[in-house]
Amino acid sequence: MNKTLSISVASHGFETLASESLRLVLDYLTIYEQFALLSSNKELLNREPLASVVVSYCERCSACRKRTEHLCTNKFKHQTKDFWTALLQYSNPTGLVELRLASCDGFDSDVLKSSQAKAAFMSLQVLELNKCSTMNAEALGLIADMCSTLKELRLRDLAVDPVALNKLITKNAESLRVVDLLGCHTIRGEDIRTLAQCSQLRDLSLWGCHNVDNASIEHVIQHCSQLERLNLRYAHKVDDKVVASIALHLKELKDLNLRYCYKVSDKGVASLCESLPRLRSLNLSQCARLTDAAIMRVATSMTCLKELRLWGCIKLTSNSVLSISEGLPELTLLDLRGRDKFEAVIGGPTALKFLIETYRSKLARWEQAQGEQMGVFKRPSMIAAAA
């Protein structure tokens, strides 16, 4: 695979193992060691795929833990076209099931034109392309031509070709459950309308898709009524009308992110409170128009909330904090980060300490969360009980 293999493998006995048992062995090996083992026996090489799941980043280093997988250098970031072509070739006969790539410059349209690519992609269920600069219109179009069983489609920080995106969504409309378009700033409203075909979609992220118009978002919402998670963070055109549409059509919603949707007001939050009492996670950070009235409404109606984020809601006062503590018994995380929160909302660190000490019983032992930024609070006793 375009790399000198320094190990010698005796394959005696491995060919007698069932595929499931052999896979347990292979999962302990690096991709090069797997290839060495399989290629030592022609029967094994023809029978077993080199890998059905390929992730280019390690998922363990500091870059991966910070969700900046494109900075990970521990696995396949700098591999050549020959490496990727060989990987596709030896992923057969079963082909790939999951492919997650972050900033892999060697993976391009030439690799996708290889004779092995079609069979490798035929059964693909999960596709993630994160900051892959080689994924131009041609490359994404080639992938779209080969995929028809996708359950998850994650295109992150890419200049996505609208024709290829349309084809990807249309060909996989019946199977898609997750669509994540985080940071795809070039996407416009007409580019996402095809999502209305995905009637079984459960998770949709348009985080940072600020060129998408409200009418297109509403169109998708009206046709994707099974959504359980919706992320509109930094989709700053979103207003109360869109939020009302969310409340009307998405009765299964459990997680809603409206961070920096600064046109949303108390009216929009009221519509959520009326129609989505079972919401579990709500992010209203930087929705600067919100007042105590909206948060008090949340506290009295959304009794199933476990996470509430209000960072940057500068009109709120300590009355909101008290109403949250008194009315949200399931809440385990409250995000009030930022100097603006301490100074404008709580009144500074001293006032916060006084508030917690004075209302200790009502605040149910709220404490600064370990490993979180200052201003993110958790209820330790409730977390321990839940565990």
Annotated model-derived regions:
Residues 1-144, 151-155, 162-169, 173, ...:
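N-terminal adaptor-interaction module of cullin-RING ubiquitin ligase components
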Residues 1-16, 340, 370-387:
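CRL adaptor-proximal regions
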Residues 15, 19-23, 42, 141, ...:
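Amphipathic alpha-helical interface elements that mediate macromolecular binding in regulatory proteins
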Residues 47, 195, 345-349:
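Short loop/helix-cap segments at secondary-structure boundaries that form the rim of catalytic
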Residues 49-52, 66-70, 90-98, 106, ...:
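Leucine-rich repeat
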Residues 76-84, 105-113, 133-141, 158-166, ...:
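Short, solvent-exposed loop/turn at the beta-strand->alpha-helix junction
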Residues 316-375:
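Leucine-rich solenoid repeat scaffolds
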